[in-house]
Amino acid sequence: MVRATGSVASRRRRKRILKQAKGFWGDRKGHIRQSRSSVMRAMAFNYMHRKDRKGDFRSLWIARLNVASRINGLSYSRLINGLKCAGIELNRKMLSEMAIHNPQGFAEVANQAKKALEATV
């Protein structure tokens, strides 16, 4: 009886790892032991940075809104507070896009936020 080696599955597994390591430098792209650890590390960084990206974009939207709201005579925090008082439920991404692509529309929204702030004071 012939010994079962599992060579097909092993080759497939190694091939998959080496394919993922394509573009790595030195032994990391061609030797399975180096490639495996490098690919695992790359996947860990990939996972972390996918989570980080969400916060990075939120920070970008807030920075854009701060600039746009100051052009319209409000700080970012007063803009957000005014929008809540006015009952305007636009999220930061939508507001940021509006500030870039439709400044007149953003100015109207900012004025509504201003009026709502003045009404509460």
Swiss-Prot record:
InterPro entries according to UniProt: Ribosomal_bL20 (IPR005813), RIBOSOMAL_L20_CS (IPR049946), Ribosomal_protein_bL20_C (IPR035566)
One GO cellular component, as annotated: ribosome
CDD domains tied to this protein: Ribosomal_L20
PROSITE patterns per record: RIBOSOMAL_L20
GO BP terms in the entry: ribosomal large subunit assembly; translation
The entry's keywords: Ribonucleoprotein, Ribosomal protein, RNA-binding, rRNA-binding
Superkingdom of the organism of origin: Bacteria
GO molecular function, one term: structural constituent of ribosome
Function: Binds directly to 23S ribosomal RNA and is necessary for the in vitro assembly process of the 50S ribosomal subunit. It is not involved in the protein synthesizing functions of that subunit.
HAMAP family (UniProt xref): Ribosomal_bL20
Similarity remark: Belongs to the bacterial ribosomal protein bL20 family.
Record protein name field: Large ribosomal subunit protein bL20
Provenance organism: Chlamydia felis (strain Fe/C-56)
Encoding gene, per UniProt annotation: rplT
